[in-house]
Amino acid sequence: MKSALNVIGPQVRKYRNLKGWTQSVLARRLQLQGWSISVGSLGKLEAQLRRVPDCEIIFLAKVLGVSTASLFPRIKSLRQLGPQFQSGGKRLAVFPTRSEK
């Protein structure tokens, strides 16, 4: 099982395909907005092989014409995201439970 470095890659691919764009077209449109990204790097992003900083998510949403929230998958459980987000992995954040409030 591959360890995903981002959760938005498949959504980026989905919205790019819905527009009928190649990776080259999307990369060029991102470059015109000021993000120097190569086709190879975009391919790695879509394949979940590279991390995506928050500022890049904003660029992607703007160019694809979608909200930033729409780039994130709908999940019912952290298990859907993969083992790196489950117990035993690194914690992303710790929120108090009702009993701790």
Go through the PLM ranges and name each one.
Residues 30, 46, 56, 72-75:
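DNA major-groove recognition helix of helix-turn-helix
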Residues 7-10, 21, 25, 37, ...:
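Residue-level signal for the short linker/turn that defines the boundary of a DNA-recognition helix
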Residues 20-44:
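Short alpha-helical DNA-recognition segment
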Residues 35, 49, 80-81:
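Short Asp/Glu-rich motifs
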Residues 1-19, 28, 99:
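A short, Lys/Arg-rich alpha-helix, primarily the initiator
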Residues 49, 53-70:
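DNA major-groove recognition helix of helix-turn-helix/homeodomain DNA-binding modules
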